[in-house]
């Protein structure tokens, strides 16, 4: 079965055991790509099991995909951040890591802006080069921006938490609805893989390093510690529903079909 996820340390750490057959589960063919590329691919038949931004899922993917409970990314203090070269108001041209990423959705909490889409790992350099005025950072960017001389303007996750009083759901693992019969076993395999990662944290070190954008071991360790947590074992369904409802009220998402289950 094709299994698509990102090359970021939290994913390669969490799914290493499943990909390498170290836990019971289906044999998988991994496909690693940037989260926005995964979001786009999720709308195609090629996506059998895939990581997908919650925001992208809500943009009309619910009719073809259903969410699994294990393997997602959520929590407190995990949100995207807006940074710039110096302290200023959020505005001007803002780089985002994709139109349908959860990061882009969360930026709407602050208003409507002129945005420029680029790969998440190019945003810091674009700000430093003056190509954009601000940028929304995800993944390792939370840990590297200060070292590059950038300044924090807003933590979008904190804004969400203060408004919604629940963890921030960033992404989930989804499976095609026509493969629903395989969903429970895949969900169990994901959970087993995450538990294996917790129990054997050094086992995936080489795999994680081979795919990481940021090679600093300290950054990689901090990334994993923050993003791989109890919600990776079981995504908070209430938090996901809060995000979908908020997006519908904002007019960002189409109304979800109430007859289609959100989770397996």
Model features per residue range: what roles?
Residues 25, 43-52, 112-114, 128-137:
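Alpha-to-beta junction loops
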Residues 180-246, 250:
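Secondary-structure end/capping motifs
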């Amino acid at each position: 079965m094709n299994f698509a996820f990102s090359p970021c340390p939290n994913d390669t750490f969490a799914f290493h055991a499943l990909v390498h057959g170290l836990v019971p589960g289906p044999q998988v063919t991994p496909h690693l790509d940037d989260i926005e590329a995964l979001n786009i691919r999720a709308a195609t038949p090629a996506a059998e099991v895939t990581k997908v931004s919650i925001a992208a899922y809500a943009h009309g993917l619910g009719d073809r995909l259903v969410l699994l409970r294990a393997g997602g990314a959520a929590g407190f203090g995990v949100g995207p951040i807006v940074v710039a070269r110096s302290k200023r108001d959020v505005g001007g041209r803002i780089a985002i890591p994709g139109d349908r990423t959860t990061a882009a959705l969360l930026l709407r909490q602050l208003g409507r802006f002129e945005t420029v889409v680029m790969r998440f790992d190019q945003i810091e350099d674009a700000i430093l080069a003056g190509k954009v005025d601000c940028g929304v950072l995800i993944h390792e960017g939370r840990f590297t921006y200060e070292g590059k001389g950038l300044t924090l303007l807003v933590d979008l996750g904190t804004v969400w938490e203060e408004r919604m009083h629940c963890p921030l759901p960033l992404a989930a693992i989804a499976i095609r609805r026509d493969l629903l019969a395989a969903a429970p076993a895949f969900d169990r395999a994901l959970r087993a893989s995450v538990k294996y990662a917790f129990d054997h944290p050094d086992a995936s070190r080489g795999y994680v390093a081979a795919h990481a954008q940021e090679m600093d071991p300290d950054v990689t360790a901090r990334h994993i510690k923050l993003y791989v947590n109890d919600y990776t074992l079981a995504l908070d369904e209430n938090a996901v529903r809060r995000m979908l409802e908020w997006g519908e009220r904002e007019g960002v998402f189409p109304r979800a079909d109430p007859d289609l289950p959100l989770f397996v």
